[in-house]
């Protein structure tokens, strides 16, 4: 009776299994495997081909795995529930549910041990490390090629020595068969592993590491030590890597499916298992028959191979194929890749209650609604409908309800209306690139088959109506409906999570209508009418008394400071009064907001202001009104365009002629040898790109002018479309009516001859041919980039998925310094923009008066930003995700504002995912949109600095020289010019290139728009610092210097060639020295000799023996020709930054202050050392031919670039620290996105960077168990050190390491998350050996094990659970104190 009762509560076991908070993975011992299984499989048969019943003891045996039909044994003796749990004495099958066939396992007892291929072949090979042999040697033993000495005895053989058959026979003859023990195959390896004394090995290895001098030995010993220690710590035995029992997975997971025509489709695993069983049985038979050794050995090898194929087919040897040469899918393949178990079934599941259809626009919907076709709703809400019909008494059973619904009577539709009301549904458009790709709407039943979507939601879904489809999902439970309504309803997602700007913004027709309405083409002196309110205006418009653009006087109602009603009188156009009528009443919302032209950007700003001042509800209503007004007036205006609206500028021909003359001039200079071919190319490209811009400018000027016509003013339609931001851009119009300009070859180089025609004039055949390049490149790029952008997003999501907001404030947060970002002297991002939404770490003070503008610990909002701008603050110290000291996740104070809500972030928000999506989403957008500008090249070379504002010029790090013409030449490598206003506040900073000409002295007053300095953008000069006679040294004709005569011009110039091509010349150092009249080398100001080393490709500007003056150019090094800038450069650049890859030509950063000294050459590289005033010099090897920024003996500061290029982020972290790294990294990523006009908040990039800095590399192990060079999680490292310090021991020391996102994802604490990302086999083998425990902290691992994610609702639930457990433990502890324990036994923990 008791048994049956327990059977009734069978499910209680399941809940036990679900209540866990971490998962551990270890090796399975043979005993463990046997404990899982329900019996041994002895036969390879599957099912009987006549009866279709499973064979006894076969792969589908019902006795082992359970019955085929619910509660029915195989022979049919026991049927029905009442015999539950009985085992039939005839067929041996337990009477139970048939779904146990999905969970019961079997096993195969192997006749001989077999090595597990993952631990053998997955690098580093764990088996070969454990036995301390090479992988090749272990393989030769396992696959029966060589014998191995297991126990040498007194023979003088080495332990683990390999012997072939002849050697074995020879030694056995020599020493006798019993004197030593040798073996072959997995048995031999098994006995070696069994005989290992782990503790002894550990001691020996520690000694070896201390004593060894060889780096290789040390590394291998450390690897072995780690392996041995993980065995000791986890209590696993190394011999478990060799299998003696193989588990067989449940039959329902590898089914046999009958097909039509009596054939069967089978899972590949069945084939693989059959192979193993066949060979195993044959081996048993051969051993019983005492067959010759050679036959048995061959059979053992075949068994090993078949087990290998079962676990990981194709990992070793040839792939085992099934029918039609198709490789069989092994167990490993079931797990890995996009189609594997992790990504296909655990992270992405199919859902019910969903449908999909084409979308059409629903202009009359409210923002929170979507149109749902009746048919779809009927199908989706069927269960609810049955329940409702039942409740209404229209149907008493489900069957009746079903019939009723099939008839589709009116009662059914009425009931459906009631159910659907206020039951939100989720709409999703693929690809879902960010969280706004899934939003909740209230369905509104419509006729037809298409889903209606609100036009303002298109931007969030990136949807258009050219055939896009969307999926509908129904949230079923009350909790799901609640979350959908509160968190996901489209009206709750007005702001974009990536930048905090509104994403619900009118576009296209709506913008065009609003723009047209806000036009004021002619302001008349005398108004056309006086009106009291909007009703009167609308009446006058409808009767035709006034037009939309007539100037009128009317009243505008608003609120004053105290919130009382205030009426203002304004004079403007009727259209603007219509717009003003939509504005909500609020003291901060003024008439001037709307009394201007309204292109898209301005409309976005207005919506933003309304949201900040009036809240969400008002904004939603306002947006809906804007939409209606926009559509209405776009339709009323009737804007369209014909070909005459594309006006080609009259002076286009003249501009092109001028440019052609300029280019002829360059050709002459080139033919006279004044400039090289590369320089000519650069100048020509420059000239044409300037010409194109001029033509485009003229065209825009022509189009933007309004013309008077008898019936009012005519505004150019095309201009309106582009200027308003409704459709098209200046770049596209330039191609339609200006000139197409320069285009790039597929390689990225720019073709010198531009396309002079535009599309309206039509292209010539040659121009058309040239432009086909751009068109095709665009399409090819799009296809390729979409994939790579999606992959970038996936990697970002994977690295950041476990980062959430864990508490309000951490204990001792650090801070970062924010300043405005300058590019070429222009402020690109103001300080207030960067500071918005951050929490201040110190008081922000006015730099002039010193008064506190914003107190510390305050979140900077829009009002705070205005204060910062007004006070002219230059720096702010604010908290950042990068410097947060929380152990798990990040605290809300360091994160700041939740951009999508405009308020402080909530605890439990999944900020990692939001950041990953914010960075990944525009990547895809941009890549999908590369081809819009048709490969037209846009080139802008900076060659001068023109001031933006007036002020006083200050030269920072001044190092100047006057040349013979009295020009000031900049000789400093990091000279900067700054402009200061009258208060001495810096208003602009410019970096100046070496060799620039300065037109002003330090302290001079400069006006706005004055040229203060210029340089040649195409070459880097080498400049003489003293006057003297130039002398060539090691510049030998034909070896290190050659005279090139240009074919076209016949002019010759001398350039340095690579002299190292021949080995005999490697010690040459081509240079130019300056000597005085007596032939002595002149000393420079810093007491070094005036020598100038030259690199290959330098063009000499002086002759041997020529007299030169200080400031003259000795040689020029041409810079690379310009390539087009496109996100194509951008996306790989972003990926390169996040992967922390080494760039091809990376910069070299000085590690300390000191003097630059040139040393001897080492293997064709120039050795340079920096000698500090005291201490060891730091040495660098620089490939020859690279241009070094410093000359012999010059002083260099820490962090300066010795060699130009992209610096390595690792170097910045090591030399300058985390704050500098953050600044550099954020700016580099932002530069790429800024170029595309995409705004992303800095904190998203910082969030990812935080995840890349999770690990610490151990330098000194102190008293910890860490080994030098080991990578340890930062939190673990800190915890260990805290413990050690508390115990009075030496803590370990280490330094932060920057890891690429892929590597960081694979190195997370969670092996489940890492395994589902990439390299599944490697991650799992590694985790099993280490006995890793997954604490289930991230989102991904929780999705995989099927629990609530620990963010949002899940975070709160976890918190409650923890509080409950703590309370229980406290209560139990108190109870124990009260009740004295009667037993004397110690309780087991």
Swiss-Prot record:
InterPro entries: DNA-dir_RpoC_beta_prime (IPR045867), DNA-dir_RpoC_beta_prime_bact (IPR012754), RNA_pol_asu (IPR000722), RNA_pol_N (IPR006592), RNA_pol_Rpb1_1 (IPR007080), RNA_pol_Rpb1_3 (IPR007066), RNA_pol_Rpb1_3_sf (IPR042102), RNA_pol_Rpb1_4 (IPR007083). One of its GO terms (molecular function) is DNA binding. GO terms for cellular component: DNA-directed RNA polymerase complex. Mg(2+) binds at residues 464, 466, 468. Zn(2+) 1 binds at residues 73, 75, 88, 91. The keyword Lipid metabolism does not apply. Keywords: DNA-directed RNA polymerase, Magnesium, Metal-binding, Nucleotidyltransferase, Transcription, Transferase, Zinc. It comes from the Bacteria. Binds 1 Mg(2+) ion per subunit. Binds 2 Zn(2+) ions per subunit. Transmembrane segments: none annotated. GO terms for biological process: DNA-templated transcription. It catalyses: RNA(n) + a ribonucleoside 5'-triphosphate = RNA(n+1) + diphosphate. It holds the Pfam family RNA_pol_Rpb1_4. CDD domains: RNAP_beta'_C, RNAP_beta'_N. It is an enzyme of class 2 (transferase). Its cofactor is Mg(2+); Zn(2+). HAMAP family: RNApol_bact_RpoC (MF_01322). The RNAP catalytic core consists of 2 alpha, 1 beta, 1 beta' and 1 omega subunit. When a sigma factor is associated with the core the holoenzyme is formed, which can initiate transcription. DNA-dependent RNA polymerase catalyzes the transcription of DNA into RNA using the four ribonucleoside triphosphates as substrates. Belongs to the RNA polymerase beta' chain family. NCBIfam families: rpoC_TIGR. This is DNA-directed RNA polymerase subunit beta'. It comes from Pelagibacter ubique (strain HTCC1062).
């Amino acid at each position: 009776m008791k048994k049956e009762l327990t059977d009734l509560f069978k499910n209680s076991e399941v809940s036990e299994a679900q209540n866990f908070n971490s998962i551990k993975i270890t090796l399975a011992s043979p005993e463990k495997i046997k404990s899982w299984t329900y019996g041994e499989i002895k036969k390879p048969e599957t099912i009987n081909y006549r009866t279709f019943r499973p064979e006894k003891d076969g792969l589908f045996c019902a006795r082992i795995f359970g019955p085929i039909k619910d509660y029915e044994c195989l022979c049919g003796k026991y049927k029905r529930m009442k015999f539950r749990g009985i085992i039939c004495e005839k067929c041996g099958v337990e009477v139970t549910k048939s779904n146990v066939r999905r969970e019961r396992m079997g096993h195969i007892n192997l006749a001989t041990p077999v090595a597990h291929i993952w631990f053998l072949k997955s690098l580093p090979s764990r088996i070969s490390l454990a036995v301390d042999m090479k992988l090749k040697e272990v393989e030769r033993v396992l696959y029966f090629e060589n014998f191995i000495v297991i126990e040498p005895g007194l023979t003088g053989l080495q332990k683990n020595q390999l012997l072939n058959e002849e050697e074995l026979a020879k030694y056995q003859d020599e020493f006798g068969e019993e004197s030593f023990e040798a073996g072959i195959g997995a048995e031999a390896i098994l006995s070696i592993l069994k005989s290992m004394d782990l503790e002894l090995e550990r001691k020996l290895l520690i000694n070896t590491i201390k004593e060894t001098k060889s780096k290789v030995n040390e590394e291998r010993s450390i690897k072995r030590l780690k392996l041995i220690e993980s065995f000791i710590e986890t209590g696993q035995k190394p011999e478990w890597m060799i299998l003696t029992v193989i588990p067989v997975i449940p039959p329902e997971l590898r089914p046999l499916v009958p097909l039509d025509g009596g054939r069967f489709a089978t899972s590949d695993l069945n084939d693989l298992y059959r192979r193993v069983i066949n060979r195993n049985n044959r081996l048993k038979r051969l051993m019983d028959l005492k067959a010759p050794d050679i036959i048995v050995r061959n059979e053992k090898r075949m068994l090993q191979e078949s087990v290998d194929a079962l676990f990981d087919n194709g990992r070793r040897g040839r792939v085992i194929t099934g029918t039609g040469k198709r490789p069989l899918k092994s167990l490993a393949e079931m797990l890995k890749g996009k189609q594997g178990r992790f990504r296909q079934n655990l992270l992405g599941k199919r859902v019910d209650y969903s449908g999909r259809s084409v979308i059409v626009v629903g202009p009359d919907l409210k923002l929170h609604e979507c149109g749902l076709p009746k048919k779809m709703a009927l199908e989706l809400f069927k269960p609810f409908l049955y329940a409702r019909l039942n409740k209404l008494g229209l149907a008493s059973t489900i069957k009746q309800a079903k019939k009723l619904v099939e008839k589709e009577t009116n009662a059914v539709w009425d009931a459906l209306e009631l159910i659907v009301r206020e039951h939100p549904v989720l709409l999703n458009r693929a690809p879902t690139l960010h969280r706004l790709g899934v939003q909740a709407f209230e369905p509104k039943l419509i006729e037809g088959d298409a889903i209606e979507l609100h036009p303002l939601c298109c931007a969030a879904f990136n949807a258009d109506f050219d055939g896009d489809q969307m999926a509908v999902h129904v949230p079923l439970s009350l909790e799901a409906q609640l979350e959908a309504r509160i968190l996901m309803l489209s009206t709750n997602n007005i702001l974009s999570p990536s930048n905090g700007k509104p994403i619900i913004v009118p576009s296209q027709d709506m913008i065009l209508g609003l723009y047209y309405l806000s036009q004021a083409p002619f302001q008349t002196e005398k108004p056309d009418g006086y009106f009291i309110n909007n009703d009167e205006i609308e009446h006058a418009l409808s009767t035709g008394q006034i037009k939309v653009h007539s100037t009128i006087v009317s009243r505008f109602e608003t609120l004053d400071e105290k919130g009382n009603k205030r009426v203002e009188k304004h004079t403007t156009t009727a259209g603007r009064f219509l717009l003003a009528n939509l504005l909500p009443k609020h003291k901060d919302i003024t008439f001037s907001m709307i009394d201007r032209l309204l292109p898209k950007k301005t409309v976005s700003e207005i919506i933003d202001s309304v949201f900040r001042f009036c809240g969400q509800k008002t904004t939603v209503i306002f947006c809906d009104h804007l939409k209606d007004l926009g559509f209405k007036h776009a339709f009323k205006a009737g804007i369209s365009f014909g070909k005459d609206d594309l006006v080609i500028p009259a002076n286009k021909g003249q501009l092109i002629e001028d440019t052609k003359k300029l280019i002829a001039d360059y050709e002459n200079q080139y033919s006279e040898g004044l400039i090289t071919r590369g320089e000519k190319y650069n100048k020509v490209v420059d000239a044409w790109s300037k010409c194109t811009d001029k033509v485009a400018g003229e065209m825009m000027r022509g189009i933007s002018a309004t013309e008077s016509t008898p019936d009012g003013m005519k505004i150019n339609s095309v201009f309106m479309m582009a200027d308003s931001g409704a459709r098209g851009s200046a770049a596209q119009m330039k191609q339609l009516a200006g000139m197409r300009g320069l285009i790039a070859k597929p390689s990225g180089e720019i073709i010198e001859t531009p396309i002079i025609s535009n599309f309206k004039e039509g292209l010539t055949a040659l121009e058309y041919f040239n432009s086909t390049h751009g068109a095709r490149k665009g399409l090819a790029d799009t296809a390729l980039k979409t994939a790579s952008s999606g992959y970038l997003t996936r990697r970002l999501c994977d690295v950041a998925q476990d980062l959430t907001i864990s508490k309000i404030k951490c204990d001792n947060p650090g801070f970062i310094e924010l300043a405005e970002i300058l590019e070429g002297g222009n402020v690109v991002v103001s300080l207030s923009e960067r500071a918005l939404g951050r929490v201040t770490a110190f008081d922000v003070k006015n730099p002039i008066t010193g008064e506190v503008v914003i107190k510390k610990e305050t979140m900077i909002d829009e009002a705070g930003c205005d204060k910062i701008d007004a006070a002219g603050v230059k720096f702010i110290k604010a908290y950042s995700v990068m410097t947060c000291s929380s152990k798990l996740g990040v605290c809300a104070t360091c994160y700041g504002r939740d951009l999508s809500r405009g308020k402080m972030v909530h605890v439990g928000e999944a900020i990692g995912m939001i950041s990953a999506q914010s960075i990944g989403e525009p990547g895809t957008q941009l890549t999908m949109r590369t081809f819009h500008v048709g490969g037209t090249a846009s080139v802008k070379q900076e060659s001068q600095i023109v001031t933006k504002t007036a002020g006083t010029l200050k030269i920072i790090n001044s190092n100047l020289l006057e040349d013979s013409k009295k020009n000031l030449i900049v000789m400093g490598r990091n000279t900067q010019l700054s402009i200061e206003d009258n208060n001495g506040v810096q208003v602009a900073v410019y970096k100046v290139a070496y060799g620039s000409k300065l037109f002003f002295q330090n302290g001079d007053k400069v006006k706005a728009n004055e040229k203060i300095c210029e340089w040649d953008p195409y070459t880097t000069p080498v400049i003489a610092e003293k006057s003297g006679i130039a002398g060539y040294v090691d510049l030998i004709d034909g070896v290190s210097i050659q005279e090139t005569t240009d074919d076209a011009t016949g002019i010759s110039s001398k350039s340095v060639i690579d002299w190292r091509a021949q080995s005999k010349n490697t010690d040459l150092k081509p240079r130019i020295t300056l000597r005085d009249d007596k032939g002595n080398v002149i000393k420079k100001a810093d007491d070094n000799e005036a020598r100038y080393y030259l690199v290959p490709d330098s063009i000499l500007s002086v002759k041997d023996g020529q007299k030169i003056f200080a400031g003259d150019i000795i040689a020029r090094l041409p810079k690379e020709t310009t390539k087009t800038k496109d996100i194509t450069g951008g996306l790989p650049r972003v990926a390169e930054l996040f992967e922390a890859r080494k760039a091809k030509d990376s910069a070299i950063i000085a590690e300390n202050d000191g003097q630059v000294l040139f040393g001897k050459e080492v293997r064709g590289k120039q050795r340079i050392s920096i000698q500090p005033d005291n201490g060891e010099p730091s040495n660098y090897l620089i490939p020859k031919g690279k241009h070094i920024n410093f000359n012999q003996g010059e002083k260099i500061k820490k962090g300066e670039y010795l060699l130009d290029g992209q610096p390595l982020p690792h170097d910045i972290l090591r030399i300058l620290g985390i704050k500098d790294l953050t600044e550099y990294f954020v700016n580099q990523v932002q530069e790429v996105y800024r170029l595309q006009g995409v705004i992303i908040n800095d904190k998203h990039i910082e969030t990812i960077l935080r995840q890349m800095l999770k690990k610490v590399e151990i330098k000194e192990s102190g008293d910890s168990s860490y080994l030098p060079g080991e990578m340890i999680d930062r939190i673990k490292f800190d915890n260990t050190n805290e413990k050690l310090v508390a115990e009075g021991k030496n803590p370990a020391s280490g330094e932060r390491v920057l890891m690429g996102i892929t590597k960081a994802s694979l190195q997370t604490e969670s092996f489940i998350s890492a395994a589902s990302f990439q390299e599944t086999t490697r991650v799992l083998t590694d985790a099993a050996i280490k006995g890793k425990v997954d604490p289930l902290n991230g989102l991904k691992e929780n999705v995989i094990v099927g629990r609530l994610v620990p963010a949002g609702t899940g975070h709160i639930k976890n918190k409650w659970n923890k509080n409950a457990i703590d309370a229980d433990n406290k209560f139990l502890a108190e109870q124990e104190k009260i009740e004295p324990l009667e037993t004397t036994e110690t309780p087991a923990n």
